[in-house]
Amino acid sequence: MRSPVDAPCVWITTLRADGSPHTTPVWFVATGDTFWVASAATNVKVRNALADDRVSLAIDGSGADPHVAQGNVVVHHDIAGFPDVVSLFMQKYDGWNLLDATVDGARVLLEISIERWLLGGP
């Protein structure tokens, strides 16, 4: 992997109300030290992020070149207000248009600011 941002997916961990972790793989793009994840608005990770903004990200779970970060998330409901991020998703994922709500319903953008790299880094 040339850079962690070139990975096809990242594992995001959010915290449930009882403090237990919820971990799932997601598509992502990055701008500087900010990672962006698009998700259906009704997903568990979104509910968790709205209640507790702490998250962790893990990239390349094979162990060959691991990257693990901690950060904070802001949930944006108006994804059309982020055309540059929408364009990055389309470029990285073969034209995938996250504005198209016909498959999963309305989507949100998770804006994740990296506070600290625990392993690796950009």
At which residue positions do the language-model features occur?
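Short, charged N-terminal helix-start/capping segments
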Residues: A40-K45, S87, Q91
